[in-house]
Amino acid sequence: YCLIAALLCAIVGAIGSVSIDSLDFWPLLADWFSEQFSTGVLIVPCMLTLAIPGVLPRFKAEQMMPAIALIVSVIASVVIGGAGSLAFPLPALIWCAVRYTPQVTCLLTFVTGAVEVVLVANSVIDISVGSPFSIPQMFSARLGIATMAICPIMVSFSVAAINSLMKQVALRADFDFLTQVYSRSGLYEALKSPSLKQTQHLTVMLLDIDY
């Protein structure tokens, strides 16, 4: 949908800009398309997953490592430069996709992509390299950032789907289908919970009723 919407917006924008800018139709079409596509890929997933959390979870120090790695990778992109530096945050974003929820992953991807677009536009990240094609730098940068942004979002939703299936499997294994109470194996696993203190005495009575 983002690709189709970006193409339609690019056609309308290029036609309307021909009489204003001194460029031809095709360079304007490429510029409009790259801008609309990168913006859509970054913003639309973030808006679709946006929600107000009911209870703010407690973050531990080790849970912040993917976000810290993401910040370090963006700084490395600025320091090293070059066209390949735009892909430096990709491993950190995939790490975030594995560890965080889709909502947090989409938000981090949006912020990272927006920061990289601003840095490239202001020449903070220098991606100027010799190329046999006369392609504007921002066109290449926008498409590269949009492509990078798709990967962690796909991983995040794949991990969320796998976790949902695992919860369904655990629910069927640990709970009785009719009564929705613990099965024998589920009760044993619950009793192994580390929240139960070792000094705490506990009496368990099992009543197995055939139905």
Where are the language model's segments positioned?
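Short, flexible active-site loop motifs that bind/organize anionic cofactors or intermediates
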Residues: 95, 152, 177
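Cell-envelope/extracellular polymer assembly enzymes that use nucleotide-activated donors
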Residues: 203
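Hydrophobic helix-cap positions at the C-terminus of alpha-helices
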Residues: 194-198
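Conserved nucleotide-binding and Mg2+-coordinating catalytic segments in signaling enzymes
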Residues: 170-190, 207-210
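N-terminal membrane insertion elements
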Residues: 100-157
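Membrane-embedded alpha-helical hairpins and interfacial helices in multi-pass inner-membrane proteins
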Residues: 1-83, 87, 91-99, 112, ...
